[in-house]
């Protein structure tokens, strides 16, 4: 939900038949899928008529595609003009800024009603929307500070971001940048690659976030200098 950059959006045509299309996906603070759609596209016309939809997000990988995890989100889509939605989407998909301002494009948010997780053969389960989303109660100060925190980390702490990705998450080295903060973790990207750093405990304020990031950076540096990592 936090790391997949594109998915299959299923909307409904007038006859009631499902219509699947490939779309870029980002995540709101709570994990709700965010989309940037052209009103000229068939799926947008479908959503304007009937907001019910689903999005399939697949991790993919080598071998049998059905052996890898995938998540289906079921809900309703609605246009949104929230500035943070635009910022979050474009940090995940910076090339989309080329057309995000076109008159026929708008941002959409899917209200999650339920989810179906399939972790591979014989490993499937259904969840309520509440179960898969991040609770935001009491985190208003953190969310308000997100843009500033991201700008600060990307400008002044690129080494720490690289250490988070490579030492704590096992990712390959690259130009890692922060793209989002929420009470449960931090989203990172390096080109087309994405990663999710989950915090040890929920954070609710900028102070909580700073303390957590300092602690994680200390842990990552320790791993970087340990004999096992050399």
In which residue ranges do the predicted regions lie?
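A short beta-turn/loop motif at secondary-structure boundaries
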Residues: 15-17, 63, 180
């Amino acid at each position: 939900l936090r790391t997949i950059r594109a998915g299959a959006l299923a909307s409904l045509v007038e006859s009631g038949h499902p219509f699947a299309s490939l779309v870029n996906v980002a995540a709101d603070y709570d994990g709700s899928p965010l989309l940037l759609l052209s009103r000229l596209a068939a799926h947008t016309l479908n959503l304007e008529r009937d907001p019910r939809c689903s999005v399939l997000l697949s991790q993919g990988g080598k071998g049998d595609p059905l052996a890898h995890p995938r998540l289906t989100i079921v809900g309703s889509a609605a246009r949104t003009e929230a500035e943070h939605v635009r910022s979050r989407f474009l940090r995940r998909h910076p090339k989309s800024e080329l057309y995000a301002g076109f008159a026929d494009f708008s941002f959409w948010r899917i209200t999650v009603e339920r989810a179906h997780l399939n972790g591979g053969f014989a490993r499937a389960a259904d969840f309520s929307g509440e179960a898969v989303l991040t609770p935001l109660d009491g985190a208003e100060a953190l969310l308000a500070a997100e843009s500033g925190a991201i700008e600060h980390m990307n400008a002044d702490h690129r080494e720490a971001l690289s250490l988070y990705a490579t030492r704590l998450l096992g990712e390959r080295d690259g130009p890692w940048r922060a793209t989002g903060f929420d009470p449960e973790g931090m989203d990172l990207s390096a080109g087309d690659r994405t990663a999710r750093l989950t915090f040890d405990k929920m954070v609710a304020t900028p102070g909580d976030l700073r303390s957590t990031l300092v602690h994680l950076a200390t842990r990552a540096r320790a791993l970087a200098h340990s004999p096992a990592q050399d």
